[in-house]
């Protein structure tokens, strides 16, 4: 299952619908703290986290760091409209705006790289 976190409801819904149509199971959250709580309840439920960099509560990079304390090596994609260089290993950056197919390619590449 993919956990997608973004505070833009329209984008979150679009990504959920698009990835679901391609056969991915998707859970969404609009806030980093809510996403962390969901992840803490069942860290093995999620195969990947996809998060915006700028979120309410705390940023996407911190969210990934906290998730990885529970599940080291969790595959992750961070998205942002601003240039960004991930500090953590194994985090893929996807610049907004992006085409849905670009996200699918990033998801497939990231999942393949983690296996």
Regions of interest found by a model, annotated:
Residues 3, 28-48:
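Acidic, metal-coordinating helix/loop segments flanking the phosphotransfer/catalytic sites
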Residues 52:
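Active-site residues of response regulator receiver
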Residues 12, 56:
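The feature encodes the CheY-like receiver
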Residues 16, 98-111:
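C-terminal output helix
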Residues 13-21:
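Charged docking surfaces used in two-component/phosphorelay signaling
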Residues 7-9:
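Two-component His->Asp phosphorelay active-site signatures
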